[in-house]
Amino acid sequence: TDYISKFEEEIIDAIEGNKNVKDSLLNYLQVFKYPNVERVTYDRNEQIYKNQIVPYMGKLIVSNITGADIKRLISTLTDKGYSFSTVKQTYNLLNEYFDYLMREEFIKKNPMNAVPTIKKSNYLAKQNKEVLPVCETITVFTDEEIEKFKAEAHKKYPSGKPKHNQAAAYILMLNTGLRTAEALGLINSDIDLEKKVMHIQRGVKEAQKRDGTERKSGREIIVGKLKTASSKRIVPLNETAIQAIIELRNERYFGEDAPLIPDADGNFTRPLNLRKRFYSILDAAGIEKKGLHSLRHTFATKLVTGVRAEDGTVKALTPRQVADLLGHTTSEITEMYYVKRNTDMLMGVTNGFEL
């Protein structure tokens, strides 16, 4: 009798719908997500699982979960002040998970059907935050900050040694709009100084060290594909960018097949180290802390809004041209981030349209 009872319990436990969310969702991540997504993406999914889902829903039985349970989770995360991005990713992971359970017929009803898609405007309103156009949420350098940053980046000790290691990398990023992963992924043979171009072909990211799906201590560098297909592109080099490349090679050069921005051993540099050195320059220059991506935003904003020449003319690029330079999939993305509404240009345009 005990044997039969134990056997029946094992059968019940083996049914996915009878498991708790903690065990079932972890199994889904390890079996279905890990083999099919980038390591960095898996790390993020795992963090969402551990920090945003398990503490609040981990003990619930899968087949008993209702839309109300998930709405309650979203509401809790909102009240705790989590960013829209974090809560949206939580929603997306749960949506994928319950869709999988439905396809495999582990549950009879999908609770996500009762949970509306999260809208950013509604989410921010609930947190009493102002809803701003995307172009007003990005951080860029002012002209004064650019000059202060460049002055600090070029400083040297009396011995002639640069004060900041590989500071020319930031000048290169400021003049090309490269993403951090793209800049670190450059190898010397990607660059043609005669033609004044560089070929963006790979990216460098950091991920959790693992033995299969099992986490190990520390982080490791992942050299792999770019963010999107359009990220693979040819980027023109202005004279400032060319000089930055020459400075980087004078500081460290390990050959044509080595990274342009190598570590001391000639290997790819960790993104974390590049960020730390960037913050060090900002601090020394007395500039308010900004993300490294601000260099890209500044470059793109300058291209769209234009640069005024000495004769008063303004040189600017179209959103389509900027999109191609940045590796955006569409020019709509470029417009959303970098084209600001100019209501002054609307003055008088309705004259003659009296109805």
For each predicted feature, which ranges?
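Conserved tyrosine-mediated DNA breakage-rejoining catalytic core shared by Y-recombinases
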Residues: T117-K120, L186-E247
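N-terminal helical hairpins
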Residues: T1-K19, Y34-P35
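C-terminal catalytic core of tyrosine-transesterase DNA break-rejoin enzymes
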Residues: R103, A168-E182, N273-S280, R296-T329, ...
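Basic, Lys/Arg- and aromatic-enriched nucleic-acid-binding interface segment
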Residues: K88, R103, I107, N113-T180, ...
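Short functional hotspots where side chains directly engage DNA or cofactors
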Residues: K195-I200, A258, G291-S294, K302, ...
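DNA/chromatin major-groove-contacting recognition/catalytic segments
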Residues: R210-R215, V314-K315, M336-L355
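N-terminal core-binding DNA-recognition domain of tyrosine site-specific recombinases/integrases
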Residues: G17, V21-K22, L29-P111, Y157-P162, ...
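Active-site/catalytic core of tyrosine-dependent DNA strand-transfer enzymes
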Residues: D143-E147, S230, P236-E288
